[in-house]
């Protein structure tokens, strides 16, 4: 457990640290209150709102609590204009065309995984059946509880989004949830 040095509220559009003025960007999706910062020299640090192409290529699923909000936050970055964007803790993008392509790639990644998960679903599957089919296709073979809990959390967030959008429907069969194409 830790104590925050400072709390940033949803309505805050900036913070001042030791006399330096930082803008605050609301970028929910990756996490509920995910934010980015604009440095005093104008660079936008967008954190995990965007990931680089290498991470996209290696990822089994996006790490996102709220897929719909994540898609909105990614798309909203198109309307911003900063001289540099710091992406997912490591890449710096200064070219607008490169940023636009990276946004497109991040959004396409989510929609590709959407199609794959829908392909994995056989109507009437339980959650356990569905995630098992996903893990088989993605060749996820871990016995480590922590690693699997991350896969399970990301899969759950994704299935919730598919349900919210009507692409999947859930029916109760006694004590089991069964999933069907919407």
What are these regions (language model features)?
Residues 18, 40, 171-174:
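Structural motif
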């Amino acid at each position: 457990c830790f104590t925050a040095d400072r709390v940033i509220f949803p309505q805050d559009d900036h913070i001042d640290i030791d006399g330096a003025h930082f803008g605050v960007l609301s970028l929910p999706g990756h996490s509920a209150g995910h934010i980015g910062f604009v440095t005093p020299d104008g660079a936008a640090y967008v954190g995990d709102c965007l990931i680089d192409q290498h991470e996209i290529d290696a990822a089994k699923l996006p790490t996102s609590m709220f897929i719909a909000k994540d898609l909105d936050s990614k798309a909203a970055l198109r309307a911003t204009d900063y001289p540099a964007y710091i992406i997912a803790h490591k890449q710096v993008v200064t070219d607008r065309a490169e940023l636009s392509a990276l946004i497109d790639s991040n959004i396409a990644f989510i929609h590709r995984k959407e199609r794959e998960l829908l392909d994995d679903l056989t109507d009437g599957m339980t959650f356990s059946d569905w995630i098992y089919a996903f893990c088989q296709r993605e060749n996820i073979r871990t016995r480590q509880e922590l690693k699997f809990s991350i896969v399970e959390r990301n899969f759950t967030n994704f299935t919730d989004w598919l349900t919210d959008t009507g692409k999947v429907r859930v029916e109760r069969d006694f004590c089991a949830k069964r999933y069907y194409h919407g």
